[in-house]
UniProtKB/Swiss-Prot annotation:
Entry's localization field: Nucleus
Keywords on record: Activator, DNA-binding, Nucleus, Repeat, Transcription, Transcription regulation
Organism: Zea mays
Residues within the DNA-binding region(s): 37-61, 89-112
Protein name: Anthocyanin regulatory C1 protein
Length: 273
């Protein structure tokens, strides 16, 4: 079951409305009010369809219709309402006083829909601008696209600078790894240098009674202290700079260990005696 036709199609006039027909329709609606559009053609003496009479009155002959071009604020509101309501033109027209759904639909299909489609494809939001800028609505992402285009044009105009920029951006500082092959030994420099003719201070000794034992321990202590003064440095044995021979560091470490063993051996012999 389809919807019943509003009127018979035989003998119905089609095409543009004349001023005489407009006056007859306006006079009838003002006298009888809106509604019952199927009876309007017969009572008004019009050879038109009832639907055609209704649309002619609502879209063109109403006294409260707002004439003129759609303003920029109205364009912005139409775009926002279309995002929420879609193609429900009657609901959109109800929020724009004086505008008809047919006018809004035609304006969207002819002008505004193309701009909104281009803005949605670019991934930006639409902002309605003032008329002195030369455009009614421009996407917010246009500025980013313009900057990208200017940068690419500058690179094409000056290829040498573009190559320099790429090289400087790709240069990364990477420190060279240094391999440490041994332990780090730190020695403290003796702050009291030994003058000529002075004797080394004994590290362990008694009074006047322990002559032989004290003499042997003093000799060992003197040898150890002298070896420490000779081989002492503020820097570690393994500096790792690679400028000198690394065998010198090994020899210095070996001599220190031998002198240390001699000193321990002397201490042990003195305690046992």
């Amino acid at each position: 079951m389809g919807r019943r036709a509003c009127c018979a199609k035989e003998g119905v006039k089609r095409g543009a409305w004349t001023s005489k027909e407009d006056d007859a329709l306006a006079a009838y609606v003002k006298a009888h009010g809106e509604g019952k559009w199927r009876e309007v053609p017969q009572k008004a003496g019009l050879r038109r369809c009832g639907k055609s009479c209704r649309l002619r009155w609502l879209n063109y002959l109403r006294p409260n219709i707002r004439r003129g071009n759609i303003s920029y604020d109205e364009e912005d509101l139409i775009i926002r309402l279309h995002r929420l309501l879609g193609n429900r033109w009657s609901l959109i027209a109800g929020r724009l006083p004086g505008r008809t759904d047919n006018e809004i639909k035609n304006y969207w299909n002819s002008t505004l829909g193309r701009r909104a489609g281009a803005g949605a494809g670019a991934g930006g939001s639409w902002v309605v601008v003032a008329p002195d800028t030369g455009s009614h609505a421009t996407p917010a992402a246009t500025s980013g696209a313009c900057e990208t285009g200017q940068n690419s044009a500058a690179h094409r105009a000056d290829p040498d600078s573009a190559g320099t920029t790429t090289t400087s951006a790709a240069a990364v500082w990477a420190p060279k790894a240094v391999r440490c092959t041994g332990g780090l030994f730190f020695f403290h420099r003796d702050t009291t240098p030994a003058h000529a003719g002075e004797t080394a201070t004994p590290m362990a000794g008694g009074g006047g009674g322990g002559g032989g034992e004290a003499g042997s321990s003093d000799d060992c202590s003197s040898a150890a202290s002298v070896s420490l003064r000779v081989g002492s440095h503020d820097e570690p044995c393994f500096s790792g700079d690679g400028d000198g021979d690394w065998m010198d560091d090994v020899r210095a470490l070996a001599s220190f260990l031998e002198s240390d063993e001699d000193w321990l051996r002397c201490q042990t012999a003195g305690q046992l005696a």
